A protein has these predicted regions:
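N-terminal pre-P-loop "Q-motif" helix
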Residues: 2-14
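Sensor-1/coupling segment of RecA-like P-loop NTPase cores
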Residues: 27-30, 119-123, 133-164
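Conserved NTP-binding/hydrolysis module of P-loop NTPases
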Residues: 47-51, 57, 61-80, 93-96
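Conserved P-loop NTPase "ATPase switch" module shared by AAA+ and STAND
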Residues: 98-127, 131
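Interdomain motor-coupling "hinge/lid" segment immediately C-terminal to the ATP-binding subdomain
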Residues: 156-253
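Accessory nucleic acid-recognition modules appended to NTPase machines
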Residues: 215-217, 222-402
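Conserved catalytic cores of phosphodiester-cleaving nucleases, focusing on short active-site segments
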Residues: 370, 400-423, 434, 453
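Domain-level recognition of nuclease-like catalytic cores that cleave nucleotide substrates
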Residues: 447-483
C-alpha cells in the first residue's frame, strides 16, 4: 500500500532523529486503532537502525520473551540466547548496545519502538517506572530515539503523558495521530471513484486509513459499502462493537449512548430519557467517548465553552456516525441473510436519508477545505476560530443556523459560509439568506472586520452575482478536489 500523508508527523520524527545524534530523544505516538500509527512508524524507520517491538495482551513473561527475541535478532545474537530476566536487564542491554552502535556508526543513531505500550504496562505495573530509570540513568547519554506507541488513548494520556506518570516531562515530542482529511483520504480511494463517490466514501468511512484501504478498486460505491458494512462477514460490520469491547469496560452502555446520539438525542437530558440513565451518569460516558475522538460537544460560534449551556453532542467520526445511523438499525435484517435488501434500501438510488446524512458530513468537508486552503496559501486567511452558529433570528423570529463561521483575529476578517448538498438549489435564495444571517454573528469585536462570504454547493452554480452589492465566493464539490 502506498504511504499517504503524515508529512507533518514525519517531519517531527525526522527532527527528533537528527537531534538524537547529539542527545537522547523520546517521542510519544498515540491514536486509536486503525489510524495508521504502524504505517507512520514503519515509514519513518525505513533505512534506519530500528528495533521494532509490538507488545500483546499476554503475560509479562511472554512480552519480555518476545522483546528478547526481537532484540537478539536485531543484534544478530543466537536465537538460543535466553530471555532477559526482567525489563531492567532488557533496557540496560539495549542502552549498552546503543553506545556500541554509536561508536561504529555515529551518524546512524538507534531507534527503539515499543508499540502497544499499554498492553505491556498493564501486565507489569512497574514498567513505566522501569523506563523512567532507564531514561534517567542509561539512555540519557545514548544517541538514540525511544518511541512509545499506544492505541489506548486514555492510558497514554494519563499513564504516560499525565503529571502523575513516572515518565512525565521526559518526552521531547508527542504526536496524537488524527484521521485523514478528505483530500488525504481520497488518495487511498479506488481509481474509478468519481468526485461524488469520494464525497460519499468519506461521509461513510471517514479518514481512518485502514477502512479506506479495504475498498475494492473494481467495485462501485454501493457494492463496496454493502460488502464491508452490510455483510455479516464484512471487515467493518462488527468494527464499532470490537472497538467498544477493547477500549471500554461497559461497552453495552456506551453502545446505547451512541445509538441515542445517532437518532438525534444531542443533550445529556435527551440521552438520559432515551436510555434510562441519570443525566449525571450520561456525562461521564460522553466524556469518555469524547476522549476516544468518537464524539464532540459543539457550541454556537463565539460563545465561551466553559460557560455555554447550549452545547450539543454529536458523533464526529464519520464511520461511527454512518454505522450507528444505517448499519446498527438493520443488524436484524443482515443477520437473517437479508443484507442485500438492507443495503439497497439505503444505498440504492438517491436515498433521502443517506443524502441528508452526506449533507451533514459535507459541512465538515467544507471546513477541511477552508483550513487546507489557508495552509497551502490558497486563501489569505488565518482561522483563529472556526465553528458553526445557531440561535434565534430576531428579525425572522425563528431559530436558524450558519454552517461555517471563521474568525481571523490577526487580519481582522470574518468568514461566513453555507454548505448546500442538493441536486436542485435556489441559488439566489441561498445567497440572500447567507447575506442576511451574517449580522447574527456580528459583535462589538468583529463588526468592522472584513466579511468573506462563501457558498459551497454540490454542483457548479449558474448564479449571476452582478447585481449583488457583496461579493460571494462559490465553491462546488468537484472543484474542491482540484483547487
Amino acid at each position: 500500500m502506498v504511504f499517504v500523508g503524515r508529512q507533518d508527523e514525519l517531519q517531527v520524527l525526522e527532527k527528533l532523529y537528527e537531534n538524537s545524534k547529539h542527545s537522547f530523544q523520546m517521542a510519544i505516538v498515540y491514536g486509536r486503532r486503525r489510524i495508521g500509527k504502524t504505517s507512520l512508524i514503519s515509514q519513518f524507520c525505513k533505512n534506519k537502525h530500528a528495533i521494532l517491538f509490538t507488545a500483546r495482551e499476554q503475560t509479562n513473561i511472554e512480552n519480555l520473551r518476545d522483546f528478547s527475541r526481537v532484540v537478539y535478532d536485531f543484534f544478530n545474537l543466537p536465537s538460543t540466547t535466553g530471555s532477559f530476566n526482567n525489563w531492567n536487564d532488557a533496557l540496560d542491554f539495549v542502552a549498552q548496545q546503543s553506545n556500541a552502535v554509536d561508536q561504529n556508526a555515529p551518524k546512524s543513531p538507534l531507534i527503539l519502538v515499543f508499540d502497544e505500550f499499554p498492553y505491556a504496562a498493564q501486565a507489569d505495573k512497574s514498567l513505566a517506572s522501569t523506563f523512567q530509570v532507564a531514561i534517567d540513568h542509561k539512555f540519557k547519554n545514548a544517541n538514540m530515539t525511544l518511541i512509545l506507541c499506544g492505541s489506548n488513548e486514555g492510558f497514554m494520556e494519563s499513564e504516560v503523558l499525565g503529571k502523575k506518570s513516572p515518565l512525565y516531562g521526559r518526552r521531547t515530542a508527542q504526536i496524537r495521530l488524527q484521521p485523514f482529511n478528505l483530500f488525504e483520504a481520497s488518495e487511498l480511494m479506488p481509481n474509478n471513484a468519481t468526485w461524488e463517490d469520494k464525497i460519499n466514501y468519506f461521509a461513510s468511512l471517514g479518514g481512518t486509513p485502514y477502512y479506506i484501504e479495504q475498498l475494492d478498486n473494481k467495485s462501485s460505491f454501493a457494492e463496496n459499502l454493502e460488502q464491508l458494512c452490510f455483510n455479516i462477514s464484512g471487515i467493518l460490520y462488527a468494527e464499532p462493537d470490537m472497538l467498544m469491547r477493547q477500549e471500554l469496560r461497559d461497552p453495552s452502555t456506551y453502545n446505547s449512548v451512541l445509538n441515542a446520539l445517532a437518532t438525534g438525542c444531542n443533550t445529556p437530558t435527551l440521552i438520559s430519557d432515551r436510555i434510562g440513565l441519570p443525566a449525571t451518569s450520561v456525562n461521564v460516558y460522553l466524556k469518555t467517548l469524547e476522549g476516544l475522538g468518537l464524539i464532540e460537544r459543539n457550541i454556537p460560534f463565539g460563545m465561551n465553552p466553559l460557560h455555554c449551556k447550549k452545547g450539543l453532542w454529536q458523533i464526529c467520526d464519520p464511520f461511527f456516525a454512518y454505522w450507528y445511523r444505517f448499519v446498527a438499525p438493520n443488524k436484524g435484517l443482515i443477520e437473517r441473510g437479508l443484507s442485500h435488501a438492507a443495503a439497497s434500501s439505503i444505498l440504492g438510488g438517491e436515498h433521502e436519508a443517506f443524502s441528508t446524512f452526506v449533507g451533514q458530513q459535507f459541512e465538515k468537508m467544507c471546513e477541511q477545505w477552508i483550513v487546507h486552503q489557508c495552509k497551502v496559501g490558497g486563501m489569505d486567511f488565518l482561522p483563529t476560530k472556526l465553528g458553526k452558529w445557531w440561535g434565534a433570528d430576531p428579525i425572522a423570529r425563528e431559530q436558524t443556523d450558519i454552517d461555517i463561521v471563521a474568525e481571523d483575529d490577526i487580519n481582522k476578517q470574518l468568514l461566513i459560509a453555507e454548505c448546500k448538498w442538493r441536486n436542485n438549489l435556489n441559488e439566489a435564495e441561498s445567497v440572500s439568506k447567507l447575506l442576511q444571517r451574517a449580522t447574527l454573528v456580528e459583535n462589538a469585536k468583529n463588526s468592522d472586520y472584513k466579511k468573506i462570504f462563501m457558498l459551497f454547493t454540490k454542483y457548479p452554480t449558474s448564479y449571476n452575482p452582478r447585481h449583488a452589492k457583496t461579493s460571494i465566493n462559490f465553491v462546488d464539490a468537484q472543484t474542491m478536489f482540484f483547487n
